[in-house]
Amino acid sequence: MADKLIRATAADGGIRVVGVITTRLTEEARQRHKLSNVATAALGRTMASALLLASSLKKPGSRVNIRIKGDGPLGGVLVDAGLDGTVRGYVDYPQVELLPNAQGKLDVGRAVGDKGYVRVLREEKGEGRNELQESIVEIVSGEVGEDIAYYLDQSEQIPSALQVGVFVGTTTGVTAAGGILLQVLSKEASRDEVLVARLESRLRKLTGFTPLLRAGKGLEDIFQELLGDMGLEIFPAVQMLRFDCDCSFERALGALKFLGVDELKDIIEKDKQAEAICEFCREVYNANERQLIELVESLQAESC
């Protein structure tokens, strides 16, 4: 099943629905970063959440950045997603592995930690100037989905129900990943409360998002199960999603500049080359002696 995003409305436009399947891109992230199972789940949930949030952006080129920094052994999670359906991300300590929780599931909450913060940065592209909106909230549980739902309630004040999940097989890698976001858009507070209660109740009754995907159900099927009796209208447009990083050799050289003239000269003398690795995708860039010398000359010219 291809990675994709679809949108829908229900309750006469009072409910906005977005769903994503992110199985392949989560598996790509697992392989690129050599992630443990619990790190895969944490990063995968955050990538699905970021893509769901990015779907509400308006202008081409706009992006959402999510940073989750908890007190657990993973250290932190950083994800960047765009309105164009691209996403990238990493965790601070990708090799961390923990025993399953009491329910026998990957213990993402303990890996992330229940103390810390969630920072969401929205960048809307504009003509001549980008509009930045940053919000920071406390971590609720470290399970990611609950934390992002809390952010939506506290910072954007949009009544929301969110469920994200990742299933990692013992030997097969990621076999199911994705999420669903339900938001109440009506202006009547009393109606909001009733709708949110119904949505949360229905989400709780689901056997979980990834079990439905593993059972062969698509996003449209899940939407029907949740909202089929509430005037559901699924939009025909389907957006394809992918893991994608905009790093480049030129950017890697720019990063090496921050080492400074003295350290670059030391590298030239001792190693004759330098290696730069992109944190988001683990792409490796190698600069040879000639390129390093040109960097030094450029820095010296800038200081004159």
From Swiss-Prot:
| Cystine crosslinks | C245-C247, C278-C281
Q: How is it modified after translation?
A: Under oxidizing conditions two disulfide bonds are formed involving the reactive cysteines. Under reducing conditions zinc is bound to the reactive cysteines and the protein is inactive.
This one is known as 33 kDa chaperonin
InterPro entries linked:
Heat_shock_Hsp33, Heat_shock_Hsp33_C, Heat_shock_Hsp33_N
Query: Is Lipoprotein given among the entry's keywords?
Result: no
- UniProt cross-references to NCBIfam families, sorted A to Z: PRK00114.1 (NF001033)
The record lists the lineage as:
Bacteria, Bacillati, Cyanobacteriota, Cyanophyceae, Oscillatoriophycideae
- Organism, scientific name: Microcystis aeruginosa (strain NIES-843 / IAM M-2473)
**GO term, biological process aspect, one:** protein refolding
Origin: domain of life = Bacteria
Q: Does the keyword Cytoplasm apply?
A: yes
- Supply one GO molecular-function term: unfolded protein binding
Family indicated by similarity: Belongs to the HSP33 family.
Q: Where in the cell is it found?
A: Cytoplasm
